A protein has these predicted regions:
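Active-site entrance/lid segments in N-terminal catalytic domains of soluble metabolic enzymes
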Residues: 1-162
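Conserved active-site-proximal phosphate/metal-binding subdomains
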Residues: 5, 19-42, 146, 151-167, ...
Length: 313
């Protein structure tokens, strides 16, 4: 695909010409963009899906009428109440600072982690009382940082590593990546895509196959799914936004547009439509395996890599 800084203007926030800028009220474009979705689904011969299926594909649980809007403040607050009620042992915040919830989480004995992509965000969550930080670089799948993994980890370690443990993340798919994160100062590694391609992972089989069939240049960063930049396996839906020169709506509105396509792509088992999110370490993953086997290889590979590195000492 090339270097991410060469993304077309239509998929970079703030880079669209004034005539194509998103208005202050994104709902003003909702009708036009929903028609774009319908046209895309017809062109790709995708099956129709009901609203509930579309919401689930966009990441929302089933909710009755009058429930909170997807990805709204009320939506997240309702989810947090469940986390607290169930007294989960570990909670990881993927977007934002969990500071306002820290006292209630800690009173339950919950260990709280935050995934961050910049040094300033690391400093903010540490000041709020976080237990661990995951420094995830641009190589990572899903929502990620504009800063590369190898550059981000040591800077975060230098900034806050004396106050909380820092875990490295972003494109780490084997033991060598784990070792590299630790050499950069992290206490360990946060691995995502490698575990998506396991028998136990809760994604569709065809999406696991898409991971094992992809190579190093097969991921892109696009706002076409959620409205925030996210790394995913290249697909026709993301390409359609570039071709049309359209600027995706900000979160949470873009999920209203992409939800039907995501659900229909899953229903039709279309690797070219909904292959899913994945990091740049995807080219190291060649088969669907049991999670325990992946874990053993990560540990063994890290130990070998760290042992090999010692010949310089």
């Amino acid at each position: 695909f090339g270097v991410d800084t060469l993304l077309p203007a239509s998929v970079r926030r703030g880079s669209a010409p004034q005539s194509g800028a998103v208005p202050e009220n994104p709902m003003a474009l909702l009708g036009e963009y929903q028609q774009f979705t319908r046209d895309f689904m017809e062109r790709e011969d995708l099956p129709e899906v009901d609203a509930a299926m579309a919401m689930r594909a966009a990441g929302a649980p089933e909710m009755g009428k009058g429930g909170p809007q997807l990805f709204s403040r009320e939506f997240f607050e309702a989810q947090m109440e469940v986390v607290i009620e169930e007294k989960v042992p570990v909670y990881a915040a993927g977007l934002g600072n969990p500071g306002p919830w820290m006292d209630r989480l800690h009173s339950n004995g919950t260990k709280v982690m935050a995934v961050i992509g910049k040094v300033k965000h690391a400093q903010q969550v540490v000041d709020s009382g976080i237990d661990m930080i995951v420094a995830q670089g641009h190589d990572g799948g899903g929502h990620n940082s504009p800063i590369g993994t190898f550059s981000l980890i040591p800077q975060v370690v230098d900034a806050v590593g004396d106050r909380v443990p820092v875990i490295g993340a972003g494109g780490i798919s084997d033991g060598r990546g784990v070792a590299a994160a630790m050499i950069l100062g992290a206490v360990g590694a946060w691995v995502g895509t490698a575990f998506l391609a396991t028998e136990e992972a809760g994604i569709e089989r065809f999406q696991k196959e898409a991971i094992t069939e992809s190579g190093d240049a097969d991921t892109i960063v696009s706002r076409s799914m959620t409205g925030k930049p996210a790394r995913m396996i290249r697909n026709k839906w993301a390409d359609a936004w570039v071709a049309a020169g359209k600027e995706p709506l900000p979160m949470p509105y873009q999920s209203m547009i992409s939800g039907p396509v995501m659900a229909s792509g899953i229903k039709a088992q279309r690797k070219d439509i909904m292959p899913g999110f994945a990091g740049q370490g995807i080219g190291l993953i060649h088969s669907i395996r049991p999670a325990a086997e992946v874990m053993r290889d990560l540990v063994d590979g890290a130990e070998r890599a760290l042992a090999d590195a010692r010949f310089y000492s």
